Regions:
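Active-site helix of classical SDR
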Residues: 141, 178, 186
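Short, small/polar-rich loop/turn modules that mediate ligand/substrate recognition or access, typified
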Residues: 194, 199, 269-271
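Conserved mid-core segment of classical short-chain dehydrogenase/reductases
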Residues: 49-60, 87, 109-127, 146, ...
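Canonical Rossmann dinucleotide-binding motif of NAD(H)/NADP(H)-dependent dehydrogenases/reductases
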Residues: 2-38, 42
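Short C-terminal tail/terminal secondary-structure segment
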Residues: 115, 167, 241, 245-247, ...
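Catalytic Tyr-X3-Lys loop
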Residues: 119-138, 158, 182
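Alpha-helical segment proximal to the catalytic Tyr-Lys
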Residues: 146, 191-192, 267
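Residue(s) in the substrate-gating loop at a strand-loop-helix junction
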Residues: 162
Length: 283
């Protein structure tokens, strides 16, 4: 018996081969939950090279892995910049399983085009980061929250924030602002939903060893005459040197905390923002 037996978890941004969303899907499934995985259909140019080489098929591949664990999995393609698609995603998930017990708001905008000073930041880039990282999370919380209230069985909402939710950095205005918004949404919705026994918490990873495409990394690799894999390996090694525990996080490190916050053991925890960073930030 798993601690999430009988639960249904909806996870956004779940299609990456080395992503946090996939790690969450597999972790929650391993503990007994049935899963809904959602992601945006990307063009080949927007896929990490390792996914292309491996012929990875986004949420199709994740769904097969979940089913191999003996759990059911529903796949839903969703563009989080379109409000109607978010509402339809939630409606389909609830209609398929009859309920949603866990929401993991994991999706984020592809970083890189935002890595400029605030005076050079384009409004459309700012808008996209706010739309995907904050507005889409609000809408998913709104629609799933309504279903949880209607069913009357409580629920768990886990929002993927970042250490950038707690500390501003130069050339990160759009990302910082969108992730600071996640903390505000988490705290306010935790209070709104507490009377219904629905908890809302945030997870704040530091650097994580994922392969999600980063436009800045791609541009830097090209400028240095390196493959993206070579450049990223150097980034991972260098970043690990500044972490007290000696390495950056793996997606599974983040998924472990998500699974705890999704469980009955976390029933009295709400409105919190937990770091997963190996000791690089303490508040």
């Amino acid at each position: 018996m798993g601690q999430l037996d009988g639960k249904v978890a909806l996870i956004t941004g779940a299609g990456g081969m080395k992503g946090i969303g996939r790690a969450c899907a597999l972790k929650l499934a391993s503990q007994g939950a049935d899963i809904v995985v959602s992601d945006f259909k990307r063009e080949p140019k927007d896929l990490p090279p390792q996914e292309v080489k491996a012929k990875w098929r986004s949420i199709d591949s994740v769904s097969e892995e979940v089913e191999a664990l003996g759990r059911r999995c529903l796949k839903i393609w969703c563009d989080l910049t379109v409000s109607d698609q978010i509402e339809d995603m939630v409606r389909r998930a609830a209609g398929h399983y009859g309920h949603i017990d866990i929401l993991v708001n994991n999706a984020r905008a592809i970083i890189g085009r935002d890595r400029v000073g605030v005076t050079d930041l384009r409004e459309e880039v700012w808008d996209r980061f706010m739309r995907i990282n904050a507005t889409a999370m609000f809408l998913a919380t709104k629609f799933v929250g309504r279903i949880m209230i209607e069913k009357g069985n409580g629920g768990r909402i886990v929002n993927m924030a970042s250490d950038a939710s707690k500390r501003g950095r130069a050339k990160m205005a759009a990302y910082n602002a969108s992730k600071f918004a996640v903390i505000g949404l988490t705290q306010a919705s935790a209070l709104d939903l507490a009377p219904h026994r629905i908890t809302v918490n945030a997870v704040c990873p530091g650097s994580v060893n994922t392969d999600r495409l980063n436009y800045w990394e791609a541009d830097q690799a090209q400028a240095k005459g390196l493959t993206l894999e070579e450049f990223r390996a150097g980034i991972v090694a260098d970043a690990g040197k500044s972490v007290p525990l000696g390495r950056i996080a793996e997606p599974e490190d983040v998924a472990n905390l998500v699974a705890f916050l999704a469980s009955d053991e976390a029933a009295f925890i709400t409105g919190q923002a937990y770091n997963v960073n190996g000791g690089t930030l303490f508040h």
